[in-house]
């Protein structure tokens, strides 16, 4: 499933990029085929993912540790399901 996550955060984009890469290396690769993180500005990004297990991805991003990171970094997101236009 092609997914877009529009995120805002209080940390720097560099810190957020590292967080996403670390998550993908440790856990996310089980649920995401590939991803592309795009910097909108220092505190906003667009993350495009090819999610192969939506339930697993949702569970992995909803752990107490992830929620604590979200809170500490002022993280907020809006998720969209993407479909190709023919």
Sequence positions of predicted segments:
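Short S/T/G/P-rich N-terminal loop/turn motif that feeds into the first structured element of a domain
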Residues: 1-69, 76-86
């Amino acid at each position: 499933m092609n997914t877009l996550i529009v995120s805002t955060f209080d940390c720097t984009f560099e810190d957020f990029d590292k967080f996403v890469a670390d998550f993908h290396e440790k856990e996310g690769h089980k649920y995401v085929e590939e991803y592309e993180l795009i910097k909108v500005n220092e505190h906003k990004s667009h993350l495009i993912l090819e999610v192969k297990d939506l339930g697993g991805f949702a569970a992995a991003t909803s752990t107490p540790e992830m929620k604590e990171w979200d809170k500490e970094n002022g993280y907020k997101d809006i998720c969209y399901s993407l479909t190709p236009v023919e």
